[in-house]
């Protein structure tokens, strides 16, 4: 009996998702927090050969407190500098990236960072390639919470999406 294509495609997608969730289900969730700031699953995308820039994200960056806070700086030994960036669509429908002076967090609010949209941390002047499976430290400076140290995991976008979905539920 032949299974119709309309049924086979969702089954195939569901199987891939289930396998990714199984593989990541045994991976320890990682994150950090100080005071009211909570960071879950810091990750970076693997860099292309010869690339001098990379990007890092958080599945969630949350402020559980009653006062606003702001991420104002970041640093890592794998890059000469880290810039805070945002991606947005301009009036002509063109995606634009720009550096920002900080990432504001309202009280009781959180943001989700993902490749291709919203905020990210641009790693400028990479000192080594970002290879899948590698980890590196990053120091984050907040106006109120102060300094938070995180361990960033280098992962492909499929693994990142699965982990972000796990943290979102």
Question: Model-found features: residue ranges?
Answer:
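Extended interaction regions within the primary functional domain
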Residues: 1-2, 23
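Bacterial N-terminal signal peptides
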Residues: 13-25
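Compact, glycine-rich, soluble single-domain proteins
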Residues: 32-169
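Sec/Tat signal peptide C-region and signal peptidase I cleavage site
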Residues: 26-31
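Bacterial N-terminal signal peptides that target proteins for export
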Residues: 2-16
